[in-house]
Amino acid sequence: ITCGQVTSQVAGCLSYLQRGGAPAPXXXXGIRNLXXMA
């Protein structure tokens, strides 16, 4: 997995990581994609 792949997959989670609250659906999908790539 490259840094670029990680960045693109977690980009949807940035607002959740910065502000908290509920993660966006894109964040959950991106994390699942990373787990599948690993």
Swiss-Prot record:
Cysteines paired by S-S bonds: none
Signal sequence interval, chain numbering: none
UniProt keywords, alphabetically: Antibiotic, Antimicrobial, Fungicide
Annotated GO biological process: defense response to bacterium; defense response to fungus; killing of cells of another organism; xenobiotic metabolic process
Keyword Ligase attached: no
Family to which this protein belongs: Belongs to the plant LTP family.
Job of this protein: Possesses potent antifungal activity against F.graminearum but not P.infestans.
Note: Under low salt conditions, possesses potent antifungal activity but activity is drastically reduced under high salt conditions.
Annotated protein name in UniProt: Antifungal protein 5
